[in-house]
Structure formats: C-alpha cells, structure tokens
C-alpha cells in the first residue's frame, strides 16, 4: 500500500465521530458512577433539611441562562469565619446540574462549611461552548458566591475547590490557574477522574494519538480556539491547550490536593493522571493520589480504595479547613 493510501486510510474517521465517542463515553462514566454506590458512601451524603441550615437556590452570577449557583448555609451562623467548599458537577462538559450533588453539598454544609454548587454553560452544537469558556464562568462566579455568603452573615476566609469528572477538571483549573487571584485563599482541592492535561500521545483511548486531524478537532472544541493539524504535528498546540490544562499551572499555585483515578478509565486517559501526579510531586505539593487498579471512570470496582480516598478528603478538610 502506498504512503498516500495509508495516509488517506489513517484520516478516514471523521472528527465528529471522535467527538461523539468522547461525549457518549463521558456520559456512560457519569451514569456508572451515579448508579454504583457502596454502603459506606452514606457517611458522605446527607439528605437536605432545615435542621442543617438554609438553602438559597438559583442565585445569578452572570448574564448566561446557566449562570446560577446554589448556596448552602450552615445553621450555626455565630462563628467569625467560615470555610467555603465549592463542588462542581460532572457530566462530560455537556450535561449535568448543580442539583446532582445535593447530597454531597448537604454533607459538607452539615460539617459546618458554607457549600456551593455552580452551574456553567454546557456545550451544545449550537453554542460552541468549550472547557475554556466554562472555566472562565467559574472564575466569574467565585467572587459573587463569596459576596452572597457575606450578605447573609457568613464571612468566608478560605475555600476549597472540588468536583467530579468534568467538575473536577474545572475545579483544578480554578485552583491552580486562577487560585492566586481568588478573593480568599484556595487552601485545598479534591476530586476524582477529572482530565488534567491534553497531550496527544495520552489520548489513545479515542485514537487521537494516531490521527492528527481528529486530535486537532477534539482539542479545538475543548480549548475553544482553532488548533490545526500542523499545530499537532509541530507541538505548538501545547500553548493553545495550556489554559485548560490544570496540571500545567500547579507551580503557579501548589495547593494541597486529594485525587482519585481508575487505571482502566476509558473516558479520560490515566496517562494524564500520571502526569498530574508527577507535577504534584515535582512541586512538593501536600497531596494524596489514589490509584484504583480495577476501575474505570466510575471508580466502581475498588470500593475499599475509594473509601480511603474519601477518608483522606475528610482528613485534609480537617487539616486545611478546620471548623472552629
């Protein structure tokens, strides 16, 4: 077979196929995660009630239809300072809602934190949304969240960014990229299975490592900028995806981190998670990295390790966000 024919065959898969596979895989990962809940997980989820505090919903932070957040205010409003925990929802950047995390946010509020779930504009074929745009919406929201807490008598002096999957990705971006500009110190980030970087060679789960055209198309959608095949070939795409690559910003704001990843993940590449671990180590971050060797994106096959991860989350919250 001639080189020209090989090249044509190599480029035969349309970009939209790769994008569709990515979205469907993310959705499947989210579904598996939500359906499979071990018994111990009840320790970290609480059904909301007025005994916990006050819930304020759908507070606007911007002009977009999705630019709204829910604020969970603990019943004890007598303390001088409060820690804020923002937990961002999963959904592959295309689905999901802040209400999906009501039990997690209620649990955080029951521990004495001001908790917040933030919606962001989900990508559709019509709006050409991107991870970059979503990360900028989160950056826009944080000062409004803190201001709203202050209006209700809760002075925020520190905060934690957290989330699952896509939400974890956005939480890490804010922590490492934008945290040094936050209204209050970001002292901790935690989450699971969020993509932290975009290296072509890591994304073999979608065949992007073998197809420059599809890789350029996928990364363009994620980054919200045009990335060409030539950019992929000569490596210049790295600068274009840097704004959405949380790992690349750790040196900017090396915040304590607790993360969990499945080695069998077919939604976001585990190779990228290893890059995150290396960066955390290199920057001497106080971190815990939990590797789940039998699990995919839902972390469903390593319950004991998943429990250790959540125990570490509590330990780090107590250490860096003590309720006093």
Q: Each predicted region: which residue ranges?
A:
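Alpha/beta-hydrolase superfamily serine-hydrolase fold, recognizing
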Residues: 11-324
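N-terminal Lys/Arg-rich, disordered targeting/topogenic segments
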Residues: 1-13
């Amino acid at each position: 077979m001639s080189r020209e024919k090989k090249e044509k065959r190599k480029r035969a898969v349309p970009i939209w196929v790769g994008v569709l596979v990515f979205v469907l895989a993310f959705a499947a990962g989210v579904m598996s995660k939500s359906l499979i809940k071990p018994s111990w997980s009840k320790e970290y989820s609480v059904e909301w009630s007025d005994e916990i505090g006050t819930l304020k919903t759908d507070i606007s932070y911007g002009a977009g239809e999705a630019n709204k957040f829910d604020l969970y205010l603990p019943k004890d409003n007598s303390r001088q300072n409060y820690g804020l925990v923002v937990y961002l929802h999963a959904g592959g950047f295309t689905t999901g809602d802040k209400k999906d995390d009501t039990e997690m946010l209620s649990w955080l509020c029951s521990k004495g934190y001001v908790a917040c779930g933030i919606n962001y504009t989900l990508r559709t074929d019509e709006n050409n949304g991107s991870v970059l745009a979503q990360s900028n919406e989160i950056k826009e929201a944080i000062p409004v969240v803190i201001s709203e807490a202050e209006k209700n008598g809760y002075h925020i002096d520190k905060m934690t960014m957290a989330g699952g999957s896509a939400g974890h990705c956005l939480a890490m971006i804010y922590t490492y990229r934008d945290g040094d500009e936050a209204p209050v110190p970001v002292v901790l980030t935690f989450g699971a299975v969020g993509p932290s970087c975009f290296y072509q060679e890591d994304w073999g789960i979608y065949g992007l490592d073998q197809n420059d055209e599809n890789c350029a198309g996928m990364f363009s959608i994620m980054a919200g900028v045009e990335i060409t095949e030539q950019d992929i070939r000569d490596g210049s795409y790295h600068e274009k995806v840097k704004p959405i690559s949380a790992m690349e910003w750790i040196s900017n704001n090396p915040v304590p981190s607790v993360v969990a990843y499945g080695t069998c993940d077919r939604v976001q590449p585990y190779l990228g998670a290893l890059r995150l671990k290396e960066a955390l180590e290199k920057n001497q971050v106080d971190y815990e990295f939990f590797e789940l060797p039998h699990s995919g994106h839902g972390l469903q096959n390593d319950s004991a390790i998943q429990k250790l991860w959540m125990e570490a989350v509590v330990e780090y919250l107590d250490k860096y966000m003590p309720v006093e």
